[in-house]
Amino acid sequence: MKRSYLKKIKYLLMLGISLLTVVSSVQSVLLARAPTGSFTHGYSGTAAEEAVSSRAVYAVSRLTDIRGMGIPEGIEKIADIATDDDGNFYLLTSDGRLFLLDGDFKLSKEYKITSADGEPLEITGARGILPMSSDDIYIADTENERVIEINGGGRVTREITKPDSRLIPEDFKFAPVKLERDSKGTLYVLCDGAYYGALLFSPSGEFSGFYGANTVKGSALTTLSYLWDALTKNDDKRAYSVKKLPYQFFDLSIDEKDFVYTCTGQTDNASSNGQIKKLSPNGVNILYKSKPDGTKTDAGSYNFGEASTEKRNNKTVVQNFTSIQTDERGYIYALDSTYGIIYVYDSESNLITAFGGGKGMQAGVFSAPEAIAYGRDKLAVADSQNNSVTVFSLTDYGRTLMSAQSKTLSADYKGSKSEWESVIREDSSNQLAMRGLAKAYFAEGDYKTAREYAKAGYDFVTYSQALGKTGSEFINKNFVWIFLLAVAVIGAAVIFTVEASKKKIVLIRNAKVRLLFNTVTHPFDSFNSIKYKNMGSLVIAAALTVLFYITAVISEMLSDFRFTSFSPLTSSAALQLVKTAGLVILFSVANWAVCVLMEGKGRLKEVFIVTAYATVPQIIYNLVFTLLSHIITSPSSTLLSGLSTAAAMLTGIVLTVGLMVIHEFSFPKFLGSILLTAFAMLLIIFIIFMLGMLLSQLWSFLVTVFMETAYR
């Protein structure tokens, strides 16, 4: 009976482990293969933006292949899709066949491309098209190293080849892939493998230089490597050295004001930032990213994709932004060809929506997305593998959202209010709508409601402005009572101080507790008493360590949202315990161990007491910070920064004096002990980490043995 009972337990445990393994495997497959749907980026208490599901701004309105479009079979893969100024869509294949599509994405016309003499023109490996109108079209004939311009009849009216210029290196290959033209008639040509930026051609076809090349991001390590090579290698060895080149632009788009937008596809596993740029006339990136605290940072340091992406063979599969479009309202559309995701950003780099993703044949996902084209609230995506086009149309929700955001960016808060309210009714978690409503209510003078929406939308600036207005109103209404209360408090404090001095009133009778507070004002005397008069208290030190942890948790949880990154989903009390109490204990053990070797006089108990007493300024700062965070109107307050610096300095001074006294060290010897203590702390952490790995492997081994035994 007992053996049967144990056998049942064994099989139940085996079944549980098997189910956990299967569930985790299925979950990982689903996460890797499922389409992303529509999402945006939002804040949830963390410093970084996170992907958040949202209502669809764009929805699939049509999915058609070449057969459905009425295009004859036998063509090569789709190379590009584009629109002209009239909203017509054009399709280019890699074998140089050009098709004009009507509003229903049916074949309206095929251009029979001929030379200027009327002879059929052979085009191979074409990769880009720029239709200005149905009678003026540019084609990037990549493999033939030329750009041709044709009229409505398909006849070539102009041909641009590699310019004869001293600005162009001898080994430069003129292989055009993408084309754009500004309002002045200047033609921008991107060439495959060119790191010099776009080639500029005047309206008459004359080469006028390069424009807007990416730059190589340097670092101290690359600088040292370059200097080392210069000192140790001869010319022959340097010739074989790998040179870091800037990433090339994959696509470009020009808006109505002739600003050039580019996208840069990443080709390695480095962290991706600045994939999208907005270039000024002199080629400088002027695109910026607005942050919740009101600051605007260079978008060159902003990741326009996702913070974390898939890994294959322990290597991160980076996102590849290979196609970009802009519209008349300043919105930016970018295609990530790696994951098939389309991103829509406003002029301040706020993500409006992202959609697509995944692999497959169903509507809304792609096998090999090649290019996107925008025209009149429609976004077409060409898939070169399926030879298909997916058309996304702006939804009513999306139209309202983008209209409201455009009005907010132009400071038309009153006009945007009703639209933002409509957005909130359909998507109550949309933070853009919350920020827009916060600005609208602030403009109306409803500061309380403005603060509520600003807090929900993580709009630090509007919240601070509304808080300042609310505080000013409160002070104006209650100035007399506030003044009388202040006078009463100050008077009571003065009277109590005088009476306490006369009558020698002692508030704290315990000498060891009084000594604790004297460590900040009289550290040498206090720590001498701890060392030579045994006035230190292990109980007080332990209580301070616990208080250090508790106040740190309070500060993280209860501080104003502008000053904390607390999130119930991501914050960990255990991590905070390690960062506070764990740090105190780790430092105490490491310093004691080091100082024993350096003939220090302090005992472990004394080191722990000194370290714990040194946390008093931090404990006070945590409480003061929590209180002031709800009063300070500026999210970048110099007052809080100053208090933080002062608390850190006081902690350092108390710790320095305390350790010098108990170990009887000179200052130089103390500095040496601190450096060795830091090394010892790292060593202890490494040992703990290794023990954790060994225990994890031991557990895996025991589970494997159990499974093998159970199956037998």
Regions of interest found by a model, annotated:
Residues L31-G436, G457:
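Eukaryotic scaffold repeat domains enriched in small/polar residues
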Residues A433, A466-L467:
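TPR alpha-solenoid repeat register
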Residues A438-S464:
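TPR/TPR-like (Sel1-like) alpha-helical repeat modules
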Residues G468-V487:
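Juxtamembrane/start-of-transmembrane alpha-helix segments at the extracytoplasmic/lumenal side
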Residues A488-K503:
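Alpha-helical transmembrane segments
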Residues V506-K605:
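Selected alpha-helical membrane-embedding segments in polytopic membrane proteins
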Residues A552-T580, F625-A648, I685-R712:
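Membrane-helix interface segments in multi-pass membrane proteins
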Residues F587-M690:
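Hydrophobic alpha-helical transmembrane segments and adjacent short intramembrane/lumenal linkers
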